[in-house]
Amino acid sequence: PFVLRRKKEQVARELPPKTEITQWVELTPAQRDRYEILRLAMDRKVREEITRQGLARSQIVILEALLRLRQVCCDLRLLDEAPAELTSADSGKLSSLLDMLEALIGEGRRVLLFSQFTSMLTLIESELQARGIGYAKLTGSTRDRRTPVEQFQAGEVPIFLISLKAGGAGL
């Protein structure tokens, strides 16, 4: 695949310098417990696979283990076996994000929110709807890419939810 990469200095010199803030978020007790259970199970599975196939042929199992651990850190509902009664309060990351979004919107800010997991964007979308916060969303399944971009650019909505894959394709 061809990827076009341009630097901000080449296309938008008027934009201020990028500000990065790293905010550490604690896992909830349920996330911590599930993470440890999954970590131990995946550790065993990965070691067994490496013993059977060798390191070079075990990459899929290793990547699957990392993916599932990342999902636990985002929200337990991203796992297939998650209990149905879980809410945003059961996710340290989602709870913190929602607090941050409300504060940013309260300051009149606008937010581009990227996620690799479209299922995480769906959870965020549900929470925004429940709070009456407007947003636009762009994922690989969005047929009309122009409308959500224009909604956000026109200031109609303060939040733009974007999947990394869709957002990297010509925005």
Question: Where on the chain are the PLM-derived regions?
Answer:
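Post-DEXD/H (motif II) to motif III coupling segment of the RecA-like Helicase ATP-binding lobe
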Residues: 1-3
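Non-catalytic, charged helical/coil tracts that couple and regulate nucleotide-powered enzyme cores
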Residues: 5-6, 10-14
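Conserved Helicase C-terminal RecA-like lobe
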Residues: 13-37, 50-171
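Cytochrome P450 catalytic domain signature, combining two hallmark sequence patches
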Residues: 41-48
